Amino acid sequence: MATAASVASDGPQSLSRQDQTLLLFAGLMEGGKEDEETVANLGKLTKLLNEDAELTKKGEPSITDVIDGDCVDTIVGYLDMRQPEAVRGRATLCTSAYLKAAGEDGKKKLSEFFHARVQRATYDDFIVAFCVASTIFPIEPDLTSELLLSEGFLPSLGPLMRRKWKSRKVETACLDMLNAACMNALCREAVQKYCVDWLEEIVDQDPEDAVTNLHHIDPGVNTQEGSISMRRHSQHVQNLAAVVLAKLRAVPAPSAGNQPGQQSEPGIPSATTTIEELSKRFTKMLVDDSGHVQTSVEGLAYASLQSKVKEELARDEESLMRLVKTLESAAPKSPLMYGALSIFANLTRYQPFETEEQKKLKQLKAYANAGGKLQPDPLNDDTHVAERCKRVFEAGITPVLVTHCKTGSVASLSLTISIIFSLSMTPALRGQLAQQGAVRLLIAAWTALPEAEDKPRRTAAQALARILISTNPALVFRQTPQSAAIRPLTSIITPDPNAETRDLLPTFEALLALTNLASTDNDTRGSIVRAAWNDIEEQLFSTNTRVSTAAVELICNLVQSPEEALSLFGDGSVKAENRIKVVLALADAEDEKTRSAAGGALASLTGFDVVVRGIVSQPRGPPILLDLCRDDSEGLRHRGAVIVNNMISHEGEVGKVARGKLVAAGAVEALTECVKKSRSPEVIQIVVQTLEVLLEQK
């Protein structure tokens, strides 16, 4: 690197970008700097590197040309775990910016740095190399995987970790590196092959045995804590090793099989620690040791992917309560917050929706892969998941989720939505969810998530629909306007175009929730029509009877608003006439609920003469309505009687034509049959009134 002495005397405004870069590196290479100054210099360097890509496109030389191997050593040296957190954080951003700006040359220099440090093999060099690898893994996973999978590297970690004299910082840095590496499938497989045995040894170490064995080997050894601790793994190191093992057990490598420890070296016992044992270790750590909360939560986040662990954790009331408290106190967007949310998401997750054909195909594949022995895990069935959801809810999770939703990231919001979605599957919990703020949470999350996050937004909308199906809108929307729920609900009326299978349940639930909202006031009805009428109308033609019925029920409530009824069915347009035909046809459907919903809509619509004119103009119009009067259902007979009474009550030409058409279609006989079948005073009264008018017509 060129020296900075020649440029130090110039003011920063007159320096070229290359000279500014050299000057910053000169400052970073000097010792004895205050942390604030180091952070500031790293920040300035990061800014220069971030700007470099755009400026080089305009023809300016890149500042990476003056960044040599020594400079790279300087930047990544600040990733050392022994550096203050603020310095490490800024160095991480700077390293990321450098790798982006330098491209392949940057990756080459970083690779050379890593291999050089590992080859030196001093404790200090190991610490820095391992810290760099763990930090850049999320930034450059391909590069870091290549470094860790270098021939001989992972096997060399065993002798290092089994040394008689332990360096806690080396061990911590090494385990942090392996922890990060487990995000990658190939690395996870290699760690399982080369590292699982000594990881087991660390986790299984008994401190008392370590002291006894050491004294037996060397009776003259000083057995005070200070000396012995250098010969055994610290509690923190054991906990980190347990987390790595949990990741290996929870997400086994494809070729590792289900026989942990099968790659054991001669004389080394096979791995025996199960995921359930690791889980118990993490829960004990969570409850008894506040100093290792982050480690315990990270371990449980992976361990709780397994069904047995889910069951044990859900039944452990003390641990559940502690997890809720941990989430409550976790900083927004922190790893601790994300880890705790992941645990609750795992505990409450239902199996994904599958068609019958998909279920059969999945069973056949599982049967073939397991040689005819594999059965579905009963602990993951809906009954067990529902019970876990109940226990999680009773632990007080909802108010905490509501609080964290205000400051959540996209990832944490997605997990939060997933948890509420699962809890809302249980109808008995929906009212309490609404009371505790779940409706506000879901509306806020749906609004906050970018449109590109379609899946979590649809999940939030469906959870909202479920809660609103089972609750009174007047009680739910005391602080939040109920119009805020309309856009999320209408967004899932149309089935997900990106889904592999056509799932109509969200459509059905959205229609039911909107029907509930439409029962409240005309403003809400108008908002629903403006937001989604075309989508609602399309569902009338659904081949799924429950969906088409739900659409008619919604329309039945929407037309309670005179303004909406006239705008949709009474403006005399061709579209309005066609809509009348469709509702008439649905009043003649085979399904009783569909006929009932269509009859309810017509009972409101026939208050308008233009709609009556449209009905009587249809040859099948009057007969369909009279069939309602003859129906075996008292409710349908009531609807039919109201419709007929409305039609004949109109004055002028419309009423006269309606009376004539109905009488010609057999209205007197139909209403006579209706009154004989009915027991309800309301039905009998309206039928008698209608008959009196029609008999006068005759």
For the regions a language model picked out, list residue spans one by one.
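Acidic, serine/threonine- and proline-enriched intrinsically disordered linkers and terminal tails
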Residues: 341-400
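Short inter-helical turns and helix N-cap capping residues of alpha-solenoid HEAT/ARM repeat scaffolds
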Residues: 34, 83-84, 121-122, 164-167, ...
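Long amphipathic alpha-helical scaffold regions
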Residues: 5, 20-273, 283
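C-terminal interaction modules of eukaryotic adaptor/scaffold proteins
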Residues: 484, 524-527, 542, 567, ...
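Acidic, Ser/Thr- and Gly/Pro-rich intrinsically disordered linkers and low-complexity segments
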Residues: 28-29, 204-234, 276, 327-336, ...
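Core helices of alpha-solenoid repeat scaffolds
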Residues: 17-22, 64-73, 104-115, 146-155, ...
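Flexible loop/turn segments at the boundaries of HEAT repeats in alpha-solenoid HEAT proteins
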Residues: 14, 54-65, 100-108, 140-148, ...
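Alpha-helical solenoid repeat architecture
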Residues: 2-9, 39-58, 77, 86-102, ...
